[in-house]
């Protein structure tokens, strides 16, 4: 079938063409310096165009991966460089969905905060393209290409508020630490190539396993290279102790950019982490509990969720608290990654479902934070949310739903995400990590419920400005979609989990 490979990469083609059109629209548009109606400024049309582009990418990902035929000729035509299998297409759907919702949030946020510059949207679109390439990378060179394409856009989005010293500082920190992590990953890849003679993940795995008469790789080069690659990817998923950039970057960036980084950058990094660990490093030489990567991932999981939850409870900034919450969720996901050694299919599917549930819950939480801000000012502290439950009950109810999902309270999507992770960990006999995850979930309830206390049980301080949530159709649309998906995934979780299992089995 001649069109096979083009059908497989159709999400990338659609998003890339849409991003190019967005750049042209921005370049040739005649923008007004100041719009009389800030909600109909130049970014409004760009936000809608970006959301449509990324939703089209999500539709193509779902149609090609899960509605089309069980087998598609040409799926492996781009291998080993880019593997557009059902595993990649599942993540492509999640990444496009997260990017589209972030674009809708930006459509309301940017004009409100006088950041109405259209270049935000092409940056977000092409960063999503890089994220999909990263998720489907079957070669270390493609992995690095996707990583940098995604990261360069994320760096620019972090510093998008150019007049803010905090935003500039956050962007510089993110860029410097991100470049250092990328250099470590690149050097690790070079060492792995020197040890195995391969850059494709399948070839690396065969060389390590000694398949097809391959010469035994140099163990010292291999271990050092694998460790450096793991460190580089741990930085992208915000695992402790490589998380220091996350709170500053998330707090300093415009909130829609923070949302995109929290869902798309993290999601793509976990996709490639699974592919690298189970593909290139899946042989017994590197996947044993005695001398392989599972102990390192397990320790990172334990540290990440515990340290992040302890620090999150001490924050006075709600946005910074959500940043540490994002780090804690990376720890929960790492528990699922560690479980893939002994319960591969169930653990991978649980990670994929958790990322979908985490994406819609996180978008909703940051989106409601945008909505609860006063006109032209963000809701930053807990005090800023005082009394929201009485003055704006719908916004408070939405925020409560998303926070309860992040806390893992039934019947939300977040509850079943954690349930499936714990089930996979128990099946892999990771009892310590399972108990630690449950205890950390209880610990996280403190800072999530603290927000509810301020919204429903506290009154604003005397003389404090009364918050008047913005009226934005784009933000409201993103919140409605997120809320519906949180409840749908919570009421019918087995459907999405079954799709994830199909994706895992089809990628083998």
UniProtKB/Swiss-Prot annotation:
> What are the UniProt keywords, alphabetically?
Cell inner membrane, Cell membrane, Membrane, NAD, Quinone, Translocase, Transmembrane, Transmembrane helix, Transport, Ubiquinone
Primary localisation category: membrane
Transmembrane spans:
2-22, 47-67, 87-107, 126-146, 175-195, 220-240, 260-280, 291-311, 321-341, 351-371, 396-416, 431-453, 479-499
> How the protein sits in the membrane?
Multi-pass membrane protein
Instruction: List locations, semicolon-separated.
Output: Cell inner membrane
- InterPro entries (alphabetical): NADH-Q_OxRdtase_suN/2, ND/Mrp_TM
Reaction catalysed by this enzyme = a quinone + NADH + 5 H(+)(in) = a quinol + NAD(+) + 4 H(+)(out)
Cystine pairs annotated here are none
Q: What is its EC number?
A: 7.1.1.-
Query: Which molecular function GO terms apply here?
Result: NADH dehydrogenase (ubiquinone) activity; NADH:ubiquinone reductase (non-electrogenic) activity; quinone binding
Q: Which GO terms describe its biological process?
A: ATP synthesis coupled electron transport
Instruction: Please tell me which top-level EC class this enzyme sits in.
Output: translocase
Q: Which Gene Ontology cellular-component terms appear in the entry?
A: plasma membrane
Q: Could you give the subunit structure recorded for this chain?
A: NDH-1 is composed of 14 different subunits. Subunits NuoA, H, J, K, L, M, N constitute the membrane sector of the complex.
**HAMAP family with a match to the protein in the record:** NDH1_NuoN_1
Q: What does this protein do?
A: NDH-1 shuttles electrons from NADH, via FMN and iron-sulfur (Fe-S) centers, to quinones in the respiratory chain. The immediate electron acceptor for the enzyme in this species is believed to be ubiquinone. Couples the redox reaction to proton translocation (for every two electrons transferred, four hydrogen ions are translocated across the cytoplasmic membrane), and thus conserves the redox energy in a proton gradient.
* Stated family: Belongs to the complex I subunit 2 family.
Q: What is this protein called?
A: NADH-quinone oxidoreductase subunit N 1
